[in-house]
From Swiss-Prot:
It is found in: Mitochondrion matrix. Pfam families: Sod_Fe_C, Sod_Fe_N. It is an enzyme of class 1 (oxidoreductase). The gene is SOD2. One of its GO terms (molecular function) is superoxide dismutase activity. The modification 3'-nitrotyrosine is found at residue 58. GO terms for biological process: cellular response to oxidative stress; regulation of transcription by RNA polymerase II; superoxide metabolic process. Its main location: mitochondrion. GO terms for cellular component: mitochondrial matrix. This is Superoxide dismutase [Mn], mitochondrial.
Amino acid sequence: MLSRGVCGTSRQLAPALGYLGSRQKHSLPDLPYDYGALEPHINAQIMQLHHSKHHAAYVNNLNVTEEKYQEALAKGDVTAQIALQPALKFNGGGHINHSIFWTNLSPNGGGEPKGELLEAIKRDFGSFDKFKEKLTAASVGVQGSGWGWLGFNKERGHLQIAACPNQDPLQGTTGLIPLLGIDVWEHAYYLQYKNVRPDYLKAIWNVINWENVTERYMACKK
């Protein structure tokens, strides 16, 4: 399982593409809770399929793609390397995003953060309620599939909300360091909430692991 309080994400999926020559295969991280632990907000069937099928598929496909990329590197086949970039982005992003997502959730979650994270939220968004409204709106507004994110802009030292399509990883595509991700692919909620994404988003706030989000925030400030 990925460390809960790590500032970056690419370092968590070691080795990076630059070290494919001696790479180790990625593996599906264990959940830090049972599949049914987030009920009634997210049911066990969704969690089991989401983790053991969808996330597992990203991991498997990432490993296959990296093997092909390694072969292309060895052959000096730049065309093949370029052709593999979309699969690396999609499956690598899926693995990064979900590895963060599982730790962002907890059966003991919900409520509000405390301490420096809460103060930063108030500073950058006006209040915790306004922050929730903005992140919810960004997540609802994702067209098709994607993610809503709370990220940290290290250059400016501020929190920032962003939405990413498909499995685009936040840090790799925007430079923001991910603190809290909300998966709005239909496989994350459809079996329970059908096509009513706002109901799912209302429910997920009850299981947000603010301790984990705070650890990520504090790590990024160092």
